[in-house]
A protein has these predicted regions:
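Active-site acidic/histidine proton-transfer and metal-coordination neighborhood
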Residues: 36-133
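Extended recognition/assembly regions associated with phosphoester-bond processing machinery
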Residues: 1-10, 16-21, 42-50, 68, ...
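Active-site-proximal loop/turn and secondary-structure-junction residues that shape catalytic pockets
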Residues: 7, 18, 26-28, 59-63, ...
């Protein structure tokens, strides 16, 4: 994040030409550990340099007692957790001097102690802190499948007025459960949810995530074209054929693609 050298030079050059956003996985907003202030101050220095449109992370915890699990672990959806995370969001926003954007995680279990639904928890968190939301449509589908619940019900109770950005990604079907792997094309069921989310969010900025088995640029571009077709409210037979099969080529760094037309508004915001 603050190593300097070529990585910093590249992000500076990108930020000079395009609107950028910063998306993290290490904030651990739900942990019982104290906030990592060194991490926050380094993040703030990076943000001051590249001037992102927003900074986002996940509604999760990644470690405890100083040990990083390197995973995005779910939090109990209770009033006590809400109080805890709201206080931490306030502190993060004070340090960063901007609203924080939080993403719904993919989940593989529910806590017996849960007293709130995830949409209700997120709505209350936004109301208390002024934070925004990053709606990961694939995570909604994965979590609802694993919990044997209906994503349509999730959408019906979701605080759409708080959505700043959306994510699309592929997942792995393990039969009895789904895993959010980001190494497959977006599934048809997720595209259908995205079409609904696009309308309800009034066209929130959208990003396609692909972290492993990364195919050719042409195949990635085809997925972007498919997303634009859904944004326009329909798909032709041709566009339906644009979803590629996974290519067995893995690289170590994720490749994330902003849908260009959706970012036009963010670019105008940056000029302003």
């Amino acid at each position: 994040m603050d190593s300097g050298g070529r990585p910093r030079q590249v992000i500076r050059k990108v930020a000079e030409r395009y609107p950028v956003v910063l998306h993290g996985v290490s904030l651990s907003i739900g942990s019982s550990d104290p906030l990592n202030m060194d991490y926050l101050h380094r993040l703030k220095r990076l943000a001051q340099e590249v001037q992102p449109q927003w900074i986002s992370d996940h509604l999760c915890w990644t470690g405890v007692m100083g040990v990083n699990s390197h995973d995005l672990l779910p939090v109990p959806l209770t009033e006590a957790t809400l109080d805890h995370i709201a206080a931490r969001v306030h502190r993060v926003q004070e340090v960063l001097d901007r609203p924080l954007i939080l993403e719904n995680p993919s989940t593989y279990l529910d806590f017996r102690a849960n007293t709130l639904s995830e949409p209700d928890f997120l709505r209350a968190l936004c109301a208390r802190t002024g934070c925004g939301l990053l709606l990961d449509v694939n995570n909604v589908y994965v979590s609802c499948f694993n919990a044997d619940s209906d994503p349509a019900d999730y959408f019906d109770s979701f605080p759409w007025n708080c959505v700043v950005q959306m994510h699309l990604a592929g997942h792995t079907d393990c039969g009895t459960h789904l895993i959010d792997t980001h190494d497959q094309p977006v599934r048809p069921e997720v595209w259908a949810l995205f079409a609904l989310a696009w309308t309800r969010s009034k066209g929130a900025a959208t990003l396609l995530e692909w972290d492993g088995n990364i195919p050719s640029f042409e195949d990635c571009h085809a997925e972007l074209l498919k997303s634009k077709a859904y944004m326009k409210g329909g798909l032709s037979e041709l566009v339906n054929r644009l979803t590629p099969d996974p290519v067995p080529l893995a690289i170590s760094n994720p490749v994330n693609f902003m849908v260009p037309d959706v970012m036009a508004g963010a670019a105008e915001m940056k000029k302003g």
